[in-house]
């Protein structure tokens, strides 16, 4: 059982206190319904060695270490392999390098310099396995709550959390839509790699705004295309072999949408083309990756002939 009472205690006296009181029952209900692979993933978690880190680095990396023998490292590696595929990372856990599909540290290095997270209550929407949540704590956040309905990501988060004493990070295996309206309790909300999966992008922006305190900050990272304020790509069918991609606006269009949704001080802090070095298959993620989704003759296009993935980071205030 996952005990959320520390979360409820931590949020006493904040605008999130009432919501936090009901989270344990909500989580228990989700756990009861479960997932067909949960027992297998739980077995992998149970197989992790019982050790404590003497070194923890969440600021410059995601690294935990201590003196341990080769047998312990082998046990760690086997258990973590039982939680494949690993998509966001990398993680350096007691001598085991979890070489994830994404070099998420590269993205974080593009985002973090533009933020002051010290003492902030943070919501990470579509948090995946929690890689960025740990990096947010490393940057000084007071607390981080991540929501993502993917059970494997939830288990991967638990694998790291068990080695950190009283971390102020909590992964809730809920969709964003399960959060109550008008929470207005977070200082910063992140939506990274989520926006283009939304059928109603403006509704998503409004929902994100509703989670923020007045003056709070949104960090939005999403796929974009070149063009002016009226340029938006809506794929006919698939985009880079993904069926669930809906709207890819230009940066000026996205900034306009944010202003229309009531955000202010809207600024673009980074635009980067995703490379096959940043997203690729590894022994920890053996399925197809970006190189399989691009035109083999021209990496500036997807297999469908659309512009290859380019991502922007937009920061805005409520």
Curated annotation (Swiss-Prot):
Biological process according to GO: tRNA wobble uridine modification
Source organism, top-level taxon: Bacteria
Binding-site list for carboxy-S-adenosyl-L-methionine: 88, 102, 107, 126, 192, 196, 311
Annotated keywords: Transferase, tRNA processing
Catalytic activity entry: carboxy-S-adenosyl-L-methionine + 5-hydroxyuridine(34) in tRNA = 5-carboxymethoxyuridine(34) in tRNA + S-adenosyl-L-homocysteine + H(+)
Ranges in a coiled coil: none
E.C. numbers: 2.5.1.-
Entry-linked InterPro entries: CmoB (IPR010017), Mo5U34_MeTrfas-like (IPR027555), SAM-dependent_MTases_sf (IPR029063)
Pfam families cross-referenced by the UniProt entry: Methyltransf_9
Record-linked CDD domains: AdoMet_MTases
Keyword tRNA processing attached: yes
Listed HAMAP family: tRNA_carboxymethyltr_CmoB (MF_01590)
Function recorded in the entry: Catalyzes carboxymethyl transfer from carboxy-S-adenosyl-L-methionine (Cx-SAM) to 5-hydroxyuridine (ho5U) to form 5-carboxymethoxyuridine (cmo5U) at position 34 in tRNAs.
Family: Belongs to the class I-like SAM-binding methyltransferase superfamily. CmoB family.
Quaternary structure annotation from Swiss-Prot or TrEMBL: Homotetramer.
Name this polypeptide is given: tRNA U34 carboxymethyltransferase
Gene this chain is encoded by: cmoB
